[in-house]
Amino acid sequence: MVLAMLGALHPRAGLSLFALYLVLAAALLRPQPLRPQRAVPEEFSAPLELSAPLSGLVDDYGVRPKHPWPRGPRPLLSRAQQRKRDGPDMAEYYYDSRL
């Protein structure tokens, strides 16, 4: 419709737009080449097992993550700086008090 309106106004512009339309239609209707079924060749596939065992949990940058649990026993009285005569800390007995 637009081509017809442009052709009515300027015959050469309508003809060049029609030629452009034909080129685009031919390019879009041309069959696309089929993609290969396997994107990665067989010689590049990774082995199923690691050749060497992991020496530790290390991320991509070589940094070992910090674990939330401390190493060794936790001294409860020295951590809270309590004395035995102060009585037990009731917040430590209920696991849902810190949530």
From Swiss-Prot:
Membrane recorded as keyword: yes
Methyltransferase keyword on record: no
Region of interest called Disordered, as start-end residue ranges on this chain: 64-90
Source organism superkingdom: Eukaryota
PANTHER family documented for this protein: PROTEIN FREY 1, SIMILAR TO RIKEN CDNA 1700029I15
Disulfide bonds: none
Protein name according to UniProt: Protein Frey
GO molecular function: protein-macromolecule adaptor activity
Cellular compartments annotated: Endoplasmic reticulum membrane
Pfam families, per database record: Frey
Membrane topology listed for this record: Single-pass type II membrane protein
GO CC terms: endoplasmic reticulum membrane
Role summary: Key regulator for male fertility expressed transiently in round spermatids where it recruits IZUMO1 at the endoplasmic reticulum (ER) membrane and coordinates the oolemmal binding multimeric complex (IZUMO1 complex) assembly. Upon complete assembly of the IZUMO1 complex, its ER retention is released, facilitating IZUMO1 complex export to the acrosome. Through the interaction with SPPL2C, inhibits its intramembrane protease activity directly accessing the catalytic center of an I-CLiP.
InterPro entries, A to Z: Frey
TM region(s), chain numbering: 13-29
Organism the protein comes from: Bos taurus
Keyword line: Endoplasmic reticulum, Membrane, Transmembrane, Transmembrane helix
Swiss-Prot/TrEMBL GO biological process terms: fusion of sperm to egg plasma membrane involved in single fertilization; gene expression; maintenance of protein localization in endoplasmic reticulum; protein N-linked glycosylation; protein stabilization; protein ubiquitination; protein-containing complex assembly; sperm-egg recognition
Assembly information from the UniProt record: Interacts with SPPL2C (via active sites); the interaction stabilizes FREY1 protein and inhibits SPPL2C proteolytic activity. Interacts with IZUMO1; the interaction retains IZUMO1 at the endoplasmic reticulum membrane and coordinates IZUMO1 complex assembly.
